[in-house]
Amino acid sequence: NTGMTAVAQMSDWTQTVGIQQMDYEGGTGSRFDLGGGVLSVGTEPAHTNIDPHCEMAYWHYYPQYIMFGCEVAPRTGGETVIASNERVTAALKDTVTGRKLFDRGIRYVRNFSDASNSDGLVSTSTWQNEFKCNDWTVVEEQCDQRGWQLERRADGGAKVTWQEQGFEYDEKTGKHLLFTSLARHGRAFDEWPPYNALDHEDRPYHVSYADGSQLSTTDLSTLDEAFSQFTIPIHWRPGDIAVLENIAWTHSRPPYQLQRGEERKIGILVSNHKPRLRQRDLSV
């Protein structure tokens, strides 16, 4: 325990643990600035489940390390749950689901509402906010630069999709490790009105196979089972800091409930941006 009293102080500890703080660029989650380059871990309601994922697995580069820090924690619940990605991958590599993720890759989906149409598709963000403009041609240019497919909805909203490989080559182990952001699957909204009334493809974000086929109930159960075998909960106390090698450890957050007067304030900062190496051969 560091004894820090505010998560904004996390940046003071980066040199101590030997990492270089970077801006959180390219992330698709909604976050609040907590000071010192530290962001909130997310804005998802406490009663929803955040599935296991490596940070920014959907992007063309990712942070080599991520640091979590705790300022305030509830008496019970609110843990961050981590899992050894090497062990999870080993459990998946001989399954049909693991093979499909490796062979087909992943398609990420983002849906944005139109700030000028309050009667359109509901989402957690507008395309004006996401792309920081009000000009559709600028959105087209940004998507083209990123290699994203852009569709303008009839209500003025935007649907963005892009493909990425499901595994990443890890130089340290010489192995391919699962690198799919399961937390971006549309089931994240199953208990989150009004988004749970939408089809998965219309929810704020979703994940399918790269060919557009959906992960089946069996696929999701296979992934859940693999992760559940190797989970380790981090029971937070104020002043705690945890540093994870991003490709080596997934993180997730089960639902929790705050009692009257309780708060959960966890910060995140990212470091050492690393370009994707992607899959090197045909074997998992």
Segments predicted by a language model, with ranges:
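N-terminal non-catalytic cap/leader segment that marks the start of a structured domain
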Residues: 1-64, 90
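Active-site environment of non-heme Fe oxygenases that use a 2-His-1-carboxylate facial triad
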Residues: 35-39, 46-52, 61-284
